[in-house]
Every structure is written in C-alpha cells, then in structure tokens.
C-alpha cells in the first residue's frame, strides 16, 4: 500500500472590515485566536491559525481589515494585510453577502488583480442573512473587473455552513509539504499575545465608539502560583484620560466587567483557574509614535 502524501501551505484571509474573517478563522481552528467585535479594525496583526488533519496542515493568516489609514497604526495594519498576499499559497477574499459591493471591496480587488498564479477564492460570507434567490446576483456583482476566481464558496462562518467543504477544497489545491507545527498547536503567537487579544476583545465589546481604536493591551506578568492557578497582570493602554475614565467606569464597574469576561475566556484557553489584575494607563498619541507601536507589539519584523 502506497504511503499517503502530506500537504501543507499558507492561506491568507483578506477582506474589508467586519466581513467575518476572524469569525471564520475561529470557526476553523475551534478556539478564540482572532478577536471578534462589531467594531471595525479589530484585527491588528497577521494572526496565524493552524488547522491540522492526518494528511494536511493549513496555516491561516488573518489580516487586518483593509481601510483608509488615519495614523501610523492604520498604515501598519494595511501594510500587514497586503504583505500576506506575497506569503500565501492560496488567498481567501471574504465579502459580506448582506452588504453591496463597495469601494473597499474594489480596492482589494484591484490588488488581487496584481496577483498571478496563486489560487484566489471568493467567499460569500453571512449567507444565513440573505434569501437564497439573492445569491446569484451577489456572485455576479463580484465578477466585474475582478480576477478569475479559482472557486466561489457561499458560507456562513457563524453557523459553519459549507466551511468543511471549503477546507477540503483548499487542501486539494495545496502541494505536498512538511508539517510546520505540532498537530495540537493552534497558533504561532505566544500565550501573552492571545491573552492580550482576549482582554482587548472585551474592551471593544463593552466600551463606546471613541475608545476601541485607541486601545492596546500589554501583559505585564504571567506567573503560575500553584498547579491549578495562574496570576496574570495586564495594562490596558489608551490615549486620553477621558478614555481611561470610560474603561474604569463608575466606581470601577466597567473594568470589573471587562476583567470578569476576559478571565472566563482565558481560563478556557489555559485550562486552569486565573487571577486577572488589570490597570488602565494613558499613553498620549501612541498610535502615531513608532517607538510606542514597537513597544506595544506592532513591529513589522515580527509579522
């Protein structure tokens, strides 16, 4: 009996903000690796999720939502998104079925037209939000001035519809290759990064619009106190004292709520009880200061 071949490769997930890229990655990996929020631009780094089967390994690069940059952080995010295209063995372009094709989609498509030889998939996400008879017109709208899609997949990342079939298909397009990561590894980011992202997710979900894009999280300490408990200290970084006041909340209610929700997710991730301490610190205009960006982990050499 001939030995079965092992396939592997890198898949870039790209799309404008809030089309469901992080939801799709988390659906595939089965853990919260990329944060999810209804706020735009929640994904800031090229988070790698790893999907492994007996005969294949796919490393997913979930890119920041493409938008017109307003500051140095925005420039970093957009540069990060498009650099992924040059690292990938396949590209998934995700669009929102419930929204018409827009200028953000056109901008991405113009860049995809420059890509040659790499398979490019069109993923019509959130099909659970539309009537079945609307689907054909949506697909046709993305054929205009666009590359020839290798495959077109209607999916629902939230419900999981058509996602297993999508995975089988992309594996069929990959070449024979090595297993880059251990079978039980879900991401190449360290625990500190993932824990920080879980905390930032709760800030995004619970605070007002003026706060989210100004928030970063630094994990100051992770220490195992005993076999069943982990002590974590984290700093939530904002740009203005008013934002600090919002995150702390009246009599500390908001920061307590953020900590409680984050702790539950971190405990699921770590498999142990967690004692989480959080502080809020003001770093004026950190998004426009290259040194601050590097200190807070937005270093292009690492991504």
Swiss-Prot record:
Residues 7-176 form the Era-type G domain. Residues 207-284 form the KH type-2 domain. GO terms for cellular component: cytosol; plasma membrane. Pfam families: KH_2, MMR_HSR1. Residues 155-157 are annotated as: G5. It comes from the Bacteria. Coiled coil: none annotated. Residues 15-22 are annotated as: G1. It is found in: Cytoplasm; Cell membrane. One of its GO terms (biological process) is ribosomal small subunit assembly. Residues 125-128 are annotated as: G4. Belongs to the TRAFAC class TrmE-Era-EngA-EngB-Septin-like GTPase superfamily. Era GTPase family. An essential GTPase that binds both GDP and GTP, with rapid nucleotide exchange. Plays a role in 16S rRNA processing and 30S ribosomal subunit biogenesis and possibly also in cell cycle regulation and energy metabolism. This is GTPase Era. It comes from Leuconostoc citreum (strain KM20). The lineage of its organism: Bacteria, Bacillati, Bacillota, Bacilli, Lactobacillales.
